[in-house]
Amino acid sequence: MEFSGTHQAFRNRWAKTDDEMCKHSMSFHLHKTLRKEFFASYLYLLEQIPLVKLYALTCEYIKGEKQFYYRAQNFYKDVPPSEEGMMGDFVEISDIDLEGSRQFLKKFVGPGKAGTKCALDCGCGIGRVSKGVLFPVFESMEMLDMMEEFILHAHECYLGDYADRVESYYLYNLQEFIPPRKKYDVIWMQWVACHLTDKDLMEFLMRAKESLRPNGVIIIKDNMARQGCKLDPIDSSIIRHLDIMNGIIQRAGLNILDVEKQEGFPEAIVPVWMIAMR
């Protein structure tokens, strides 16, 4: 197909730039500048030729998954373990975000719905969502994050008395985590699906499906692109259009129960959507 040759040309040119020019250059600034300009060119190509698949962007174009995930982990090393760190420049919308999550969760938990025994918070950070949304509903929690500093701060400081109700902390990258079978009433994934490639997100959702208790649900809350997809090469986050996300969910064998946009955020912020599935 037409776009295949173009995509291969981009890959070949970047490999030469990265392996020959940048490897021998003493200028880290030059290296970063070249990367930024090259990513910008590739994203322009994606917009012009929508048949280019996001999987190629995240898994092939960035010279393999290890580099893609290393960049995200390296980015979060500089993020402070605080609400400000978790919310970036938008800590003022934290309460709005939590209230929207609480109202969405109510639709799926209670008599005749998902139980309240145990929930898993994926990409939990310091536990902002666990503390503000999940602990008030569930008897116990399990929390997962790739950053040890965040988990330690959650347990030792941020969660307070709630920490006594945490069954397990998992220091894992989500793409490598195998959740226990039939364990959770709710699996909450907020601002973490954006850090997985299409393939790894689909495969994690397949594993997560097997870890749900009867009537259990998986909830993804994440930034959604207004059109196509966008990659931030600094922190390796992918903003997908809602249709792209829905396609990944369906390929994982899950049924979408409800989709709702988070209201009350400033117009300048990328739209945030909540998706419930089982």
UniProtKB/Swiss-Prot annotation:
GO CC annotations, alphabetized: cytoplasm; nucleus
Record keywords, A-Z: Methyltransferase, Nucleus, S-adenosyl-L-methionine, Transferase
Family annotation (SUPFAM superfamilies): S-adenosyl-L-methionine-dependent methyltransferases
Top EC category: transferase
Source superkingdom: Eukaryota
Subcellular localization, as worded in the UniProt entry: Nucleus
Transmembrane residue ranges: none
Protein's name in the database: N-terminal Xaa-Pro-Lys N-methyltransferase 2
Source organism of the structure: Danio rerio
Taxonomic lineage: Eukaryota, Metazoa, Chordata, Craniata, Vertebrata
